[in-house]
Every structure is written in C-alpha cells, then in structure tokens.
Amino acid sequence: PVIIFPEGTRTQPGTHRPYHPGIAALYSQCDAPVIPVALNSGLFWGRRSYAKQSGTIIIEFLPPLPTDMKRRDFMQRLETQIESTAERLALEGADRYPLTRPALVQNRDTNEASPSTGPAVD
C-alpha cells in the first residue's frame, strides 16, 4: 500500500489546505481503488510544531473510492470524505481532551473567515 497525505503536509484541525493534484495523477494511472483515511493527529501534534500533547490519535479508514471516476469528481469526493470525517474526529477528540479545544475553535474561526479555494485540479 501507498499512503499519501493529499494536502502534502500535516494540517491543523479546522483548517483547510488545497489537495495536491498528484494523488489524482496516481489514481488515474494505477487503476486501483483509493482508500481515504482521516485522522485527528493535528490535535496532538500541530503543524510546524515539535511539541506533542498527550492523547489518543484516531484513524478512520473510509470506504474505497471506485477506479472509474473522472478526475474532478475523484478529487472532490476524496476531499469531502476526508475533511468531513477529520472534522468529526477532531471534535470528538476535543471533547475527550479539553486542552485541545481552544486551538480547534481558533482554527475553525480563521478558516471560516477566509473562503476555501476548493480542491487543486486541472
């Protein structure tokens, strides 16, 4: 298996980074299903941070995406599934680990103030 973070880096929960189109190129060339994976690790290990907080990282494997999708549809579905699940996992984690909640709320407020550019596709 190949594991790829389509954003190209870790992201803080509640923030959005455009997905890189390389995953769509691999998808179109490999004729293999893509299994989206969402996690809440950003609650405990922030982007550009060496400091880590104690907590349990939750990883959720989502249903495989079929191999016959158009590139734009694939990117949109991949991003929608990962982001919505990651947000749910982050909220659940913040409920269990209250110290992570302020960063989550701050990131969500900042993200809502600047509109998303949507997935990076060509």
Segments from the language model and where they lie:
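Non-catalytic C-terminal accessory region of glycerolipid acyltransferases
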Residues: 1-122
